[in-house]
Amino acid sequence: MNGQLNGFHEAFIEEGTFLFTSESVGEGHPDKICDQISDAVLDAHLQQDPDAKVACETVAKTGMILLAGEITSRAAIDYQKVVREAIKHIGYDDSSKGFDYKTCNVLVALEQQSPDIAQGVHLDRNEEDIGAGDQGLMFGYATDETEECMPLTIVLAHKLNAKLAELRRNGTLPWLRPDSKTQVTVQYMQDRGAVLPIRVHTIVISVQHDEEVCLDEMRDALKEKVIKAVVPAKYLDEDTIYHLQPSGRFVIGGPQGDAGLTGRKIIVDTYGGWGAHGGGAFSGKDYTKVDRSAAYAARWVAKSLVKGGLCRRVLVQVSYAIGVSHPLSISIFHYGTSQKSERELLEIVKKNFDLRPGVIVRDLDLKKPIYQRTAAYGHFGRDSFPWEVPKKLKY
């Protein structure tokens, strides 16, 4: 069933069920371009200097990339090359697509890390005892509704974008361009605090395309080659609503269509609106920035609790102060899905996890140049990362 332009539908929602929506964006979305460039810069430094202190923000607009931030590192980096390679990998390789890695202007405004921060966080300290790079609060979330312990809404939204990129790169759909957005609404049933996906209610896909392809051809291909290849058939029914290329035309995309900034897709990067978010972005930051490392650790804790059978759904909060190594607080919320109390789960977490940044970096191997891969399709729910390997808990 195709969605109406005014969005109205008469689908009835049964008692005890609810709708939840998550979105994702593709590699060529302007904000995601910036995330990937920031993490490409971080990786370039870590390859040469695993102890580099990096805070790199990126701005993208038509024909221009700006790097801004603070970096202290022994590495010698060719920023022009790093930026252009990242854009080339994304697929902006011709001006007809609105952006070209060969001709864009790359501006660099990078300085040293503030000595005030350095002396307060890591100078003259053992690695285990380094302080948090800033204050803040971070969350980790896990749910047993999927094998990945991630919400189905965000899993499907990411996979739709990944399928678009695959079909673009292998030439199956040559009219595709790198910029894309997806959104998935799932109907859930509540089950004693846990959530059970029943069906996919609505799917939205908007993807950049060339001038020649017609709208009907695009909509047909998106349904047959993208949605049906990604979304399990059991979740689709005759009442599922599709908004495919709802604007009708999306030729101008990427940084030409909208300016891009690092750190503007923090919900896409995490749990798609489930759980909670402390507000700190990930990309372009080394492990001393707890916005990133502690959020990864909190996810590790949450997934370990769910995979260990201690609860079906859980939210973990941690908080830090700049220069202080131990977290100020750790909180566990299990939504009533555990036979143990939240206090008992907290004791298990404290017994099994050391959440100081200098220990997180060792446990999760965060000095390795792995970050550019995290910067598209979500930082969580992908098996290749250490924080996705659940820890066997002792209690």
Curated annotation (Swiss-Prot):
Family membership, please give it. Answer: Belongs to the AdoMet synthase family.
Which E.C. number(s) belong to this protein?
2.5.1.6
- What lineage, starting at the top, does this entry show? Eukaryota, Metazoa, Chordata, Craniata, Vertebrata
Q: What does this protein do?
A: Catalyzes the formation of S-adenosylmethionine from methionine and ATP. The reaction comprises two steps that are both catalyzed by the same enzyme: formation of S-adenosylmethionine (AdoMet) and triphosphate, and subsequent hydrolysis of the triphosphate.
Q: Which residues bind L-methionine?
A: E70, Q113, D258, K289
The protein in question is named S-adenosylmethionine synthase isoform type-2
| Cofactor annotation | Mg(2+); K(+)
Pathway given for this chain reads:
Amino-acid biosynthesis; S-adenosyl-L-methionine biosynthesis; S-adenosyl-L-methionine from L-methionine: step 1/1
Q: Which residues bind Mg(2+)?
A: D31
Report the CDD domains cross-referenced here. S-AdoMet_synt (cd18079)
Q: Which UniProt keywords apply?
A: Acetylation, ATP-binding, Isopeptide bond, Magnesium, Metal-binding, Nucleotide-binding, One-carbon metabolism, Phosphoprotein, Potassium, Transferase, Ubl conjugation
Q: Which reaction does it catalyse?
A: L-methionine + ATP + H2O = S-adenosyl-L-methionine + phosphate + diphosphate
Please give the residue positions where the record annotates the modification Phosphoserine. Answer: S114, S384
The residues the record assigns to binding ATP are H29, D179, S180, K181, S247, G248, R249, F250, D258, R264, K265, A281, K285, D291
Q: Where is this region: Flexible loop?
A: 113-125
